[in-house]
């Protein structure tokens, strides 16, 4: 397995290119960006996607695959192997890749500038040190600081309603603090490290065993907060251009399993308009604070609504959210033709510190909303795939069909890894997007898609995975 697992890009001499560097699930965002850049620059633009996703086949144009972790495991076990790679590790590998560096140099012989577009800005991305290369997104230094949950809770108390919290340095301090708080925070204690997403490095604890089984080392600084029983986990997607201009795309409801594990979202939110309006207002305030800190671009805010209908801040994600592509597809159908979509708004925020004059924000509780939901099937343990899932269609096209009422319900399965792969725990087997005329039809589509995905996992996957692991030791 070479440094580049797969590539199929072809350079058109009459086209300018930017690079997308990130996971394949956000590939579709770049189509919106290339359309905007083509129009704004009055010349054809396209993109080349550098992704870490190891799949059996790629029904995507202009892709190059680099995954240093999968490459190392493939060399050890001599089997097709797929795994997620941490963002910093991936960005570092891409930044040092001779293949990518040569690609950029080749592009710079034909165009004056190469943009790099990412899902999240990482400090490990250093390709913009090259002359003529720039990041089309937030500053990585600023994003890293703002994504620190401890920094958020300590510095955003005057901006958003933050739960009661404490900061603990090391396991001993964590144990001492929680011993005092168990009798007071009787519904549980949420424990997380400074950087955690989708349930990793976090736990809702009701005793010390819950914590010690999750965290094996004392090297972390921990944030603990009072857990509040709640029914709703709304997430708000937005773009900030400056300290007074924050665009809110809308509110979706997150699906949280096991108390802290994010598996997808549904839209439109079931929350009443007055609560959604409050979420809009809070998110604008958070966005203005982000701008004061130097952040420009797409971001998301997660909240909970407790049993007394009080809104509590959970976190801000100084990056694109998992719902960004779905919101682009939704807004394209609901807003007037020609208004800028989220990637174009981010472009103007980064380059010009403002939004274009024809920006149009959706109203709260927009009439005629498209119903959709997503489900990310992440594996809790190593597995083997013994089934094939063909490419199921274009997500953007499906939203168009739903908006024109050409279909009453539909779901697509995306990024299925493929047949005869060893898949590492923590990897996505695939992603489901369902559309319908109401929430019920969306849930039916998600359930059916999940069954189809799960059917591709080998029944004897535990034995198979153990055999493969044993071979790696031999």
Residue positions per predicted region:
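Short helix/strand-bridging catalytic loops that position acidic/His residues to coordinate divalent metals
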Residues: 137-142, 267-270, 325-334
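Short, surface-exposed amphipathic charged segments that create phosphate/polyanion-binding patches used
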Residues: 62-64, 80-85, 149-155, 178-183, ...
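ATP-dependent carboxylate activation and anion-phosphoryl transfer catalytic cores
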Residues: 255-261, 274-474
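Short, flexible, solvent-exposed loop/turn segments with mixed acidic/basic and small polar residues
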Residues: 7-11, 154-156, 191-193, 418-424
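A conserved helix-loop-beta module that forms one wall/lid of the active-site cleft
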Residues: 129-201
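ATP-binding N-terminal substructure of ATP-dependent carboxylate-amine bond-forming enzymes
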Residues: 1-141, 172-176, 448-449, 457-461
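Short acidic/polar capping segments at secondary-structure boundaries
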Residues: 121-123, 141-143, 171-172, 194-198, ...
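Internal nucleotide-binding/catalytic subdomain
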Residues: 201-308
